[in-house]
Structures are given as C-alpha cells and as structure tokens.
A protein has these predicted regions:
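Conserved AdoMet/S-adenosylmethionine-binding subsite of the radical SAM
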Residues: 91-205
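Charged/polar, solvent-exposed surface patches and flexible loops
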Residues: 22, 72, 76, 149-150, ...
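Conserved Radical SAM active-site core
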Residues: 18, 25, 37-40, 44, ...
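Compositionally biased amphipathic helical and low-complexity segments enriched in hydrophobic
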Residues: 5, 66-68, 175
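N-terminal cysteine/histidine-rich coordination modules
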Residues: 2-35, 42
Length: 205
C-alpha cells in the first residue's frame, strides 16, 4: 500500500475498481448535511499522516471492489446522500469516476478531501469538503493552495482546531484568501483526542 502515500499515483483502468476500507450507513455528523441519513464510502490509503487523524485504520488494507459493486452496495440504503471519504479518496484516481457515476444516478454526493491533492477534475456536482490543514496537523506544508481556485458556493472548507495557534492561523487564511466568499460554509472543527505525546494542546482561551 506504499503507493497510496504518493501524491502521483498513475491513472488506472476503471475496471480495476477501488480499494475500500468500509461502506456503512449512518447519520452525517458534520458538514452541510449534518443529521441526515448518509451512506459513507471510505476509500483506503492516504498520503498524509495528520497528528489528530481518527481513521488511521484506513491507511492500509481494504478490499478491492468494482465500481459497480460499490454503487450497488451504496444503493441498498434508501437515502440520496452519499459521502466519499478516506483516508484521502483522491489518492485513488478511479475515485473521480465513482463520483461522476454516483451523480449521474441522482445521488447528492459529498467528497471529504485533505486538499493535498488536485481537486480540479472533481465532478462539479459533488460538494467538496476541503480540510485545509492547520499547523498542529504537522501537514500544513502539504496544503495545495491552487485548490482554492476550484472551490464554489457548492463547496465547504473545514479547519481542525486543536489550540489557539490553529485558530489564529485559520482566521488568517480566511482573510488572506477571502474563503467565506468562495464557499457555502466554513467550519471550525475542534479536536481534543490527539495521541498523547504527539502534540501539545493548550487551552483555546
């Protein structure tokens, strides 16, 4: 699975499908569809190693499934909402094809992405939820700022806030890039359960 840590994975044949960690049905816990029944499709692999990541189990393993099987499984639940997440879904090029096919079938699709990989080719009907990495993630140097040019009012931006420094940094990005004018919603998402000894978490105020 080392290739899924690379940001330059070659495009593969759609027939190869995708490596999937899990597909499950639950209530959306964040973003604009908060509280709505949603099918989550979690893709395997991620090029980042954020200090506060709560889905490290998705870094490796998974099961390779055809696009048809993934769509059929997701369609068994009677909800129009599908969230494609990871890991980093865009680490697998066939994710782009999956997103398009889901939209063609009439689903309301959101994509949770780290923002470290190019989003310019993501299907426009998809609501991108771009997680701009804050300093405490230890991955803020991986933010691909050109992605901000491809955000619309259909999209959202998320900042994971672990401490006051993250909060101030996030406010500065809002001002620098006028992010509130680019997207429908900007989320400040607090994180508390960071692995002990990895980072210090001083009080927010």
């Amino acid at each position: 699975m080392a290739s899924l840590r690379s940001s330059a994975i070659p495009v593969s044949d759609p027939a190869a499908g995708l490596r999937i960690t899990e597909i499950f049905y639950s209530l959306q816990g964040e973003a604009n569809t908060f509280g709505l029944p949603t099918v989550f499709i979690r893709l395997t692999g991620c090029p980042l190693r954020c200090s506060y990541c709560d889905t490290t189990y998705s870094f490796e393993g998974g099961e390779r499934l055809s696009l048809e099987h993934i769509i059929e499984t997701a369609s068994q639940h009677k909800t129009p909402y599908i969230c494609v997440t990871g890991g980093e879904p865009l680490a697998q090029p066939n994710c782009l094809i999956l997103l398009q096919r889901l939209c063609d079938l009439g689903f309301q699709v959101s994509l949770e992405t780290s923002g470290a990989l190019d989003v310019s080719k993501v299907e426009p009907r998809v609501s991108k939820v771009l997680d701009l990495k804050t300093p405490t993630s230890n991955e803020d140097h991986r933010n691909l700022l050109t992605n901000l040019d491809y955000l619309t009012q259909h999209d959202q931006i998320k900042f994971v806030i672990c401490n006051r420094a993250d909060y101030e940094w996030s406010k500065q990005q809002l001002e620098n890039f006028q992010l509130q004018d680019k997207v429908s919603t900007v989320w400040f998402s607090p994180a508390f359960a960071v692995e002990k000894g990895t980072v210090a978490l001083p009080a927010l105020a």
